[in-house]
Amino acid sequence: PPRSTPLYSSAASDVYKRQIYHGDSNQVLDFRTLQRHIARDTYSELLFKGVLDDQSNSIYTGLIQVANEASGTNAFQTNRTLKLCDQAWAESVPNLEIENNDVKCSHASTVSPVDENQRFYLESRGVPTFEAEKLIVHGFLQEVVSSLPVEAINIWIAELFNHKLSARVAHSE
């Protein structure tokens, strides 16, 4: 499976990792990350956001490791998954392995369907169902996309997700 294993071995190093994904059809996506801190005063912030459709599955397994000599570490891990239909399935397994008390570490995980109140709000203002769902997905992913430093990449990602969501409508008709 795809793995991400940054090693924080220099004092005062900072890493911000962002990732988005979209699963459809019967895809199985397996993500594994390791944030390994072995030096003092390091910082890591990991944010995964995914959208699942059809019978796609995702599993995220993440581990923050903080060595005994890594005092002053700040490490954060977040995984959020948005299910577009009931047949999609997601599992998230965040873990902490901390050997030093002088740290700030946390992990968070959610798997949720499209918020029906958000959809209703948009539809009650004349937004068609499909467009409402696209807006919700784009809003969900915006935290990651807006943090990317290259505007052309942001535009490309938005176009890619628009294409995938448009294919979803064509497939369901």
Task: Describe the role of every protein-language-model region.
Residues 24-28, 37-173:
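Family-specific signature for flavin-dependent thymidylate synthase
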